[in-house]
Design a protein with these regions (language model features):
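Short alpha-helical
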Residues: 48-49, 72, 155
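Conserved small/polar residues in nucleotide/adenosyl-binding loops
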Residues: 216-217
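Short, glycine/acidic-enriched loop or turn micro-motifs at the edges of active sites
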Residues: 16, 74, 101
Length: 217
């Protein structure tokens, strides 16, 4: 499939927050249209959908992929791109129009959480090359690799995310799910046996949580 080099592939993630967040998509779309942005957009439809759509866009030749969503959607998108068959993954620009509850990536990079400046930033082709981290692990007997842009949590942090995702089905709101996860773990002090190697240093022991971040100075 041949795609114009300047055309955006936009993935809108409607589940990234509340009804107010979903409503803002119409305003974002109208603003992109008013700016003459050439784009195709697709809407995610459930768990794993953003990753699958990002992979399809990368395979179909889109070299600017824009996520309208939060940190979770952004993480799924980078995995879709990295797991795609595109030969020039390093030339794919991943943009973000913050539209979720958690926008840590945008805040860290000083990106506006307002959609108009975010769209303008992408239009002006303001690019920065950053690292992509990855984590190899086993899910049962199956070896897997996941990529990340912000951080990867092992132990307590990962447990909180897992419980949040599970309880979100019942609470419906991510914030309440997060509070429920914290409450359920408040009396739990589970330690994990780990062996960490950081450069030439080895750390062995029972550890509650580890957070590995990509930081820039």
């Amino acid at each position: 499939m041949s795609v114009e080099p300047k055309k955006w592939g936009v993935i809108y993630n409607p589940k990234a927050g509340t009804r107010k967040v979903k409503k803002r998509w119409k305003e974002i779309k109208e603003y992109m249209d008013s700016k003459g942005v050439d784009y195709d957009y697709v809407q995610s439809e459930g768990f794993g959908s953003v990753e699958r759509l990002a992979k399809i866009l990368a395979n179909n030749g889109y070299r600017t992929i824009v996520i309208v969503g939060g940190d979770g959607a952004l993480n799924d998108a980078i995995n879709g791109i990295m797991l795609s068959d595109a030969e020039d993954k390093e030339n794919i620009a991943l943009g973000m129009i913050p539209n979720g509850i958690g926008n840590d990536f945008a805040k860290y990079w000083g990106l506006s959480t307002e959609y108009k400046p975010a769209v303008d930033c992408i239009i002006n082709h303001r690019l920065k090359k950053i690292d992509v981290g990855y984590c190899n692990f086993y899910d049962g007997n199956e070896h897997q690799r996941r990529y990340f842009l912000n951080a990867v949590n092992i132990g307590l942090g990962a447990r909180i995310v897992k419980i949040t995702d599970q309880t979100k089905r019942f609470w419906g709101v991510k914030f309440l799910s997060y509070v429920a996860a914290l409450f359920s773990l408040i009396f739990e002090r589970k330690l994990y046996r780990m062996h960490l190697r950081i450069n030439d240093e080895h750390i062995r022991g029972r550890i509650m949580t580890v957070c590995i971040c990509l930081l820039y100075t």
